[in-house]
Amino acid sequence: VVIAGDLFETYDPPEGLVQRVMASLQRLEDAGIFLLTTPGNHDEITYVNSVYRNHKANWPGVLVTNPTPELVHSGRVGGRDVNFYSLAYTGGITPAGQPLTNLPHTGEEGLHVAVFHGTLGMAQERSLPLDRAALGAAGYDYVALGHIHKAGQERLGASPVVYPGCIEGKGFDDPGTPNWTVVNFGETGVRIETPPVEVQTIRVETIDLTLLTSPEELEERIVALGDVKAQVRILLTGTVQFEIAAEDLVGRHAHRFWHLEVRDRSDSLDPELIERWGAQRTVRGAFIRQMGERLQAAETEEERLLAQRALLYGLNALRLSA
């Protein structure tokens, strides 16, 4: 088990929480499961009262404390010889102004796995930047990354580089990735699996009102999204042809979700305003006149709705481009 940083939300979590977490980690070690923990930036080791400084002596498994990249453990894991490389960012000691390029590799027999709580490329706020070219040249069999909460994978040289993501979300802006990341090292290479984890789902759904012609259609879309186990935020976008009230929608449909938010980001267009725009000698005016001709020529309700939606989409695109 590899923890690539930010096990805790802060460097000095409540002691009761620390003891519960350490007891759970100890169960892994007692079961013969290898464990490596790398501090992150939320639970940074820099501080004198950091949880990792306070519990360094009795932390289960391998605790990374060195401020620069180095070999932190070599041993048998799952019947294979494995060499682990990592660092614990330490303010004032760990180089952070430019992406790290000094990435060691002993060349010894066995697998070589790097574990970094960092970001690929240039530095971001409160991040440890890692040089892509250096990671690719280091020749690791696998690179486990933390810091970015969204799951992602890429290959640098022969090395698979993986962000597992945050398993359980913290909110709508950080919804999490409800999967474990399981890495299998076989004779033919590395196989990465992402089995699902049963956690509460956090979703952000978008409904484009330009496609809808009545409040009833909107209600049907919301009903279709219902999930009593999920936190859901619905964003209403596009150009609306009818009146809506986000609070009323929440009131009518909240029982279909564990938690429901509706945010109205739509625009509405007054028919009289469209008519005035259509009389103008502008690109927008010419577009409105052309679509008006199509509306008048429509022979079926389907053709009329298609022309109406095209008009609204076009006006919205012209507004955004302006």
What are the residue ranges of the model-derived segments?
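Accessory, non-catalytic peripheral segments of nucleic-acid enzymes
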Residues: 187-322
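Glycine-rich phosphate/diphosphate-binding loops that line cofactor/substrate pockets in enzymes
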Residues: 1, 30, 225-227
